């Protein structure tokens, strides 16, 4: 993750070999969807990703109704949701779940306004329910996902806006940075670029130049292997 940040700052193309980059991971995309909604309620892609993640009883029929209203009235999904709730145009259970989501985003946006970026992101993630959702996950990956969310908070605490971010809020500047990390800096497989990979993955590839990171006593080789006869 720290290598990715440094390469982005230096505008050096890179590729993560055999794995996902940090900002491509599902749990990070989930958290960013909430952050984008906090920054702007009318981000439709973020609305679709966050509205039922974690699951809160908002089904496909409800989302279809919101999409149809947004299409018919040329408005955002957020505005369509508000319109449908005011018009009582959906079943009570679905309406309650949808209103709970809208209220959550409004409350966390207003309640964190003016706070430091890292603190704001930490509170948004906590209120979203994502940490609890992944903590209770039974797929064996929940703890890793929670740790990635914690690393996202750490990344916002380290974040320093660039000169071109002048005029943007800290949150908007970070979201623009995240969008860049998720897109343009990812090199194609055969581009001239820095390749990030494990030592095991690098075996036999015959790169002309290789840097070994973490070559520290007790870490590489691992202390356990040093004890073997």
Where are these regions (language model features)?
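Conserved helicase C-terminal RecA-like lobe
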Residues: 3-13, 21, 25, 29-229
């Amino acid at each position: 993750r720290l290598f990715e940040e440094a390469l982005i700052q230096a505008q050096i193309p890179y590729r993560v070999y055999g794995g996902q980059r940090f900002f491509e991971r599902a749990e990070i995309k989930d958290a960013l969807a909430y952050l984008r909604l906090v920054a702007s309620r009318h981000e439709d892609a973020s609305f679709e990703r966050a509205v039922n993640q974690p699951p809160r009883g908002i089904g496909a029929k409800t989302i279809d109704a919101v999409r149809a209203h947004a299409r018919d009235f040329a408005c955002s999904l957020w505005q369509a949701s508000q319109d449908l709730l005011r018009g009582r145009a959906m079943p009570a259970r679905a309406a309650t779940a949808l209103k709970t989501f809208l209220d959550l985003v409004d409350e966390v946006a207003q309640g964190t306004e003016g706070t430091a970026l890292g603190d704001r992101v930490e509170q948004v993630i906590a209120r979203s329910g994502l940490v609890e959702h992944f903590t209770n996950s039974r797929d064996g990956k929940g703890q890793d996902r929670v740790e990635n969310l914690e690393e996202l908070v750490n990344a916002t605490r380290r974040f320093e806006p660039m000169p071109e971010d002048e005029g943007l809020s800290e949150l908007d500047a970070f979201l623009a940075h995240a969008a860049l990390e998720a897109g343009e800096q990812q090199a194609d497989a055969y581009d001239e670029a820095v390749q990030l990979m494990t030592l095991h993955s690098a075996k036999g590839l015959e790169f002309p130049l290789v840097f070994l990171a973490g070559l520290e006593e007790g870490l590489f080789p691992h202390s356990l292997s040093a004890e073997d006869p």
